[in-house]
């Protein structure tokens, strides 16, 4: 079973202002990220706006993603849903169209008991032969995938091979890494917050799936590569810059439009339009983003 590691951007979905998929921009974003040295691309995550799409839209984007990337790096497709049936259909569709793996957030709206959660993930994992990465984002789902839960799921399902742990806690990441890897050493643990990339590597984790890699992949890629080469000084220097970027996320709720604006700032031809109910970011917020990116050397003075 393939092991995933490194920097895997959760790619922002690109739309025209009428809400249709902007395939040209999608290709340019993929080319940009691959040329920057990322280790994979994750489509239809939180910043990919999967929650505002119907099943047909998600399938169409997944097909386009696989076509555009064309085997240059692994493609992960988000399949999570409040509906187990929909998640299974999306998983099987991703496999049929050539994805390299799937990512499944736990069902949201309901807070489900362990046996319900186990059944949800077992149905997804057993419906495909693809590797499955769990996605923990308790701030949005209302329910934490605890290290004990993840260990149980990993032991029950051989193709559950990793987790994106989007939680602002070094302790949670440490316990996740130590607990799951003690029984599945090959299990991949990715942080979901930019400011925990270096922490994750120091703790024995495997990389990051973080939003800033959409517009500043050179920082997270540089940190990861420096760490792998034993150059902690370079990793620490780059990390000081990366630590400033999460301030962007506090400027709008949700912050998805500001990620797209940041991508615009670095020259990518993307609209800042997002699918409703997410409105375009304010001009005031955009100005603050521009100042921040300039201060960190991502944009020229």
Curated annotation (Swiss-Prot):
Gene Ontology biological process terms from the UniProt entry: aldonic acid catabolic process
EC number(s) per UniProt?
A: 4.1.2.28
Q: How does gene deletion manifest? A: Disruption mutant has reduced ability to catabolize D-xylonic acid. YjhH-yagE double mutant cannot use D-xylonate as the sole source of carbon.
**Any one cellular-component term (Gene Ontology):** cytosol
Substrates-to-products reaction catalysed: 2-dehydro-3-deoxy-D-arabinonate = glycolaldehyde + pyruvate
Compartments, as annotated in UniProt: Cytoplasm
PANTHER family recorded = 2-DEHYDRO-3-DEOXY-D-GLUCONATE ALDOLASE YAGE-RELATED (PTHR12128:SF28), DIHYDRODIPICOLINATE SYNTHASE (PTHR12128)
Q: What is this protein called?
A: Probable 2-dehydro-3-deoxy-D-pentonate aldolase YjhH
- Organism of derivation: Escherichia coli (strain K12)
Q: Which gene holds the coding sequence for this protein?
A: yjhH
